[in-house]
Amino acid sequence: PDGTTTTLGREGSDYSAAVVANILDAESMSVWKDVDGVLNADPKIFPDAEQIAELNYLDTIELAYSGAQIIHPKTIKPLQNKNIPLYVRPFGDKRKPGTVIRGMSAPVVVPILILKKDQVLLTIRSRDFSFVLEEKFATIFSLLERFRIKTNLIHNSAVNLSLCVDNSWHIDEAIEALREAGFDVMKAENMELLTVRGYTDELWRKYA
């Protein structure tokens, strides 16, 4: 607003291309990356990462939400609206097919692993030991929203709510606001969150 220059953020160029593809009713869209396509894990962390040949739009959005960095979920929506396939290809070797993302695809046959570092585990409990139900959920998440704290995992019991959240400059302010609202809060820092889709016993033995 008011002539202020801004950007679309991470992967903004991909999103811009997706909007143009939507407007032009393109047959497909290609993005060029420094990897062979969409992989089932970050090869810098998991050396045995494998390429995924096909994904559907919803799986791609879920992976992006879980922390996969290759495609931003904003990029998918304009393509999904008109069922435009997205090809993720390596700029180092244009002959490789990469990964295709579209409305219908074959099931993913390899497990998908996403590791998010620098996480904070918050354990929240009402001081009167009352159940953590809808009203308290609303209070907790409205406070987290106020301080722009992104929640990546939720686990609740009768009196406790455990949240794995991204670390943030405002995390301590959010905790103080929760305490002022009548909650006890415990914080564990320097945590990691491993998300696994397609869990197997072999993966448990390897990474537990």
What are these regions (language model features)?
Residues 1-208:
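C-terminal catalytic "cap/lid" subdomain
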